[in-house]
Amino acid sequence: MAFNDDNFMLKNEAAKRLYQQIKDQPIFDYHCHLDPKEIFEDKVYDNIVDLWLGGDHYKWRLMRANGISEEEITGSASKLDKFKAFARTLQRSYGNPVYHWSVMELKNVFGVCELLTEDNAEEIYHRINAYLVEHQISPRKLIADSLVRFIGTTDHPLDDLAWHKRLAADDTFETVVAPTFRPDEAFIEHQCFADFVARLAQATGRTITDFKSFIAAMEERIAYFAENGCKASDISFTEIVFEAAEPEQLDHLMTRVLEGYQPQPLEIKQWQTAVFAELCRVYKHYGFVTQVHFGALRNNHSAIFNKLGADVGVDSLGDQAALAINMNRLLDHLVQRDSLPKMIWYNLNPSYNITVANTLANFQANENGIAGYLQFGAGWWFADTKLGMISQMNALAEQGLLANFVGMLTDSRSFLSYQRHDYFRRILSTYLGEWIEEGEVPEDYQALGSMAKDIAYNNAIQYFS
């Protein structure tokens, strides 16, 4: 069987027919971690390592598993040596999604059809570097060549959004680059919480002395983001919690934390519940899609974290007790307060997929006729795999309406990661094609093709409008 050809990952004839209907659709990448400054400056790359390996903790994680020294991963080894070290790892990474992503990127972006190995790494390294310069490969070219129509970046609440403003004013660049409000530091367990409150007060010109004034200042920043094209918020929680607290408790807690007090687990849960509920109220007012990533246990290798910082490949999927109870209580609390915005929930631990999909189905009712008001998001991070995608789609199809799914996102720091949209579309086509082949749905390529098109692109446009 041929590998990585036009029918890559398409397991049956039905899949091939469905894929033909969606393969050339544009991309609506509603959540990523790209830097808008890099998009605006649009510098031409001259080395594949900067573009392909820099900041890619997926690849770093595999390289460590293959015994590669840190010197050749994040250290001061030459770029050629780092490329060779990754090639040595890639040829042993069968079964890992990084293998599929990498061979797709090499072929579809750089025209490298042969498999990268330690033996041919140096020749391919120099060939790609020449290609980068000859074809003037830059962020905007990669975006345009991938037919990306929308990019949702991830941004600090105090960001002045200067680069987003410059991009919006640039008539030569057609892709919309919108900010996303990501207030991680608004939660008291964050080591930068006190500094964040001080900077928030300075940015808004407000005196922040209690919970109410804190939320008012946050609302001002949300309004600023809305004025500058923001369509969504995002947050990452280790666990989904629900613990009610009185305003006086929150005021007292905030005062103590700002004085250096280390909050206890119950207090962290109370603050998370209260702040998130208030933010959701404001998000709904401004029409933001509220994205919730949960279940990551971060920075587990303390030595590597202390040396390199966060997002370097030492994170895990977590677990938690009473997810169903907490998630249902939280969503019901938002409904009772008329504060339930459109939401996308990304679950990191696939063992909770049915729980999440089932819970979201309880709260789909809305007065605006929005299909899929609460979304079960695509497989995230460690679940961004073939089996992870299928598990998520299985749970959504069985517990809700897969046809209303807003589909794929890169959630990536790499301008090469748009190949993941094609990877998802191939897996989606096979998934739906198997339904046809096994007689589980009518052999109606117009209906199934329309469903595939909606999931691949159309639903996201409508949902974020």
Curated annotation (Swiss-Prot):
Enzyme Commission number(s) from the entry: 5.3.1.12
Catalytic activity: D-glucuronate = D-fructuronate; aldehydo-D-galacturonate = keto-D-tagaturonate
Source organism, top-level taxon: Bacteria
Stored Pfam families: UxaC (PF02614)
Pathway note: Carbohydrate metabolism; pentose and glucuronate interconversion
Keywords, in A-Z order: Isomerase
A GO MF term: glucuronate isomerase activity
InterPro entries per the UniProt record, alphabetical: Metal_Hydrolase, Uronate_isomerase
GO biological process: D-galacturonate catabolic process; D-glucuronate catabolic process
PANTHER family (alphabetical): URONATE ISOMERASE (PTHR30068:SF4)
Family designation: Belongs to the metallo-dependent hydrolases superfamily. Uronate isomerase family.
Protein name in the entry: Uronate isomerase
Gene: uxaC
